[in-house]
Amino acid sequence: MGRLISVSFGLLVVFLSLSGTGADQDCLPGWSFYEGHCYKVFNVKKTWEDAEKFCQKQSNGKHLATIEWLGKANFVADLVTLMNSDPDLDWIGLRVEDKRQQCSSHWTDGSAVSYENVVHNTKCFGLDQKTGYRTWVALRCELAYHFICMSRVPRGA
């Protein structure tokens, strides 16, 4: 029981820090502010490409979330943990799409990879609930998951 109260209190603190800063007034309702950007978790499932298009339609300058440093990674992980209604995987705005790209790995017999046969040769990335949304996982782009959109705070806001 004590652990449940501790976890509940911890989530309350995270929620208040995400939604009660006053700076989030620069974001649209339902969006959370962090370091000059607004973020929102969408609890509908879409493919990576459809999620990116959906984010772009929300407003000019919106995209799937970009995670450029540890502080932002922690913020996004906490936001997804709090706002995701169906914990699983969530798309972020990272995709590898170079048809000439070769893996730098090795096969189990030690030979170098000189050929790659990946479906659509495209890898999209998401956050995994199993790691508290703190690690990126390569996923098939055509699968549908929840996603996080991000936008810059408008100048002068």
From Swiss-Prot:
Expressed by the venom gland. Its main location: secreted. It comes from the Eukaryota. SMART domains: CLECT. The keyword Calcium does not apply. Disulfide bonds join 27-38, 55-149, 124-141. Residues 34-150 form the C-type lectin domain. Pfam families: Lectin_C. Residues 1-23 form the signal peptide. SUPFAM superfamilies: C-type lectin-like. InterPro entries: C-type_lectin-like, C-type_lectin-like/link_sf, C-type_lectin/snaclec_domain, CTDL_fold. GO terms for molecular function: toxin activity. Keywords: Disulfide bond, Hemostasis impairing toxin, Secreted, Signal, Toxin. One of its GO terms (cellular component) is extracellular region. The keyword Signal applies. It is found in: Secreted. Interferes with one step of hemostasis (modulation of platelet aggregation, or coagulation cascade, for example). Belongs to the snaclec family. Heterodimer; disulfide-linked. Shows greater sequence similarity to the alpha than beta subunits compared to other heterodimer snaclecs. This is Snaclec A16. It comes from Macrovipera lebetinus (Levantine viper).
